[in-house]
């Protein structure tokens, strides 16, 4: 069966910077290299400061925060107010979808029609529920990506910007443009893949840029969305 992480009752001690270069060893086979595939080289280390809790005087970290790494930042000014292991490298899972969303928003008209393949509709992991053979607007697919964390919508959007390889090149280029020096995106949907890495600091950069984008901010502020159906597949909310 799938590996299930243990329940924590305290935050891990990161004072010794255990994740300074790369995430901890994978606990499943999801990052197993294909035959002949080289081991990815981690991004160069750019931070040599402390890796524990870094807070201003008088700041009390809530007792129920058990994350290995986190950052509290002002989305308007970009100022980081408090943090823990800010440049420690971790697997981002689906929160890395923010980069794909920004690339798509910057590149495609929201009303562009995108056909959906069997490969898109049948992606593993979380799915919004789009149907193979259907056609959806970029706006529809972005809502499925950001509201339902759809790996199916992520795959469909990636094909619309040139395919998997092009999408990975573009999201990694955007990460570098944003100054995300701890980040390597090996999977634009957040599924585990060899070399996948980001940090709390980098994600603060990505989400600050995202919330300054009116289209992104509007989508994630949506309470509900009517997803269209087609043929015998009904629409859904």
PLM ranges: what are they?
Residues 123-159, 234-237:
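Conserved catalytic neighborhood of penicillin-recognizing serine enzymes
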Residues 70-81, 100:
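Short, glycine-anchored, charge-dense loop/turn motifs used at functional sites
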């Amino acid at each position: 069966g799938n590996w299930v992480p243990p329940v924590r009752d305290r935050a891990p001690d990161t004072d010794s910077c255990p994740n300074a270069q790369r995430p901890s060893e994978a606990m499943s086979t999801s990052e197993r290299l294909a035959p002949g595939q080289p081991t990815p080289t981690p991004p160069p280390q750019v931070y040599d400061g402390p890796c524990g809790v870094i807070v201003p005087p008088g700041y009390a970290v809530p007792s129920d925060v058990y994350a290995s790494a986190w950052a509290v930042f002002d989305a308007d000014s970009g100022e980081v107010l408090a943090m823990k292991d800010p440049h420690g490298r971790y697997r981002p899972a689906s929160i890395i979808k923010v980069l794909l969303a920004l690339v798509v928003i910057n590149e495609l008209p929201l009303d562009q029609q995108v056909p959906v393949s069997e490969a898109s509709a049948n992606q593993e992991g979380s799915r919004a529920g789009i149907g193979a053979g259907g056609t959806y607007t970029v706006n529809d697919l972005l809502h499925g990506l950001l509201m339902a964390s759809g790996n199916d919508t992520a795959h469909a959007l990636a094909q619309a910007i040139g395919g998997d390889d092009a999408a990975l090149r573009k999201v990694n280029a955007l990460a570098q443009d944003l100054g995300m020096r701890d980040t390597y995106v090996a999977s634009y949907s957040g599924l585990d893949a060899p070399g996948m890495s980001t940090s709390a600091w980098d994600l603060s950069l990505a989400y600050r840029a995202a919330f300054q984008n009116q289209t992104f901010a509007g989508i994630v502020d949506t309470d509900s969305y009517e997803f269209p159906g087609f043929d015998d597949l009904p629409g859904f909310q």
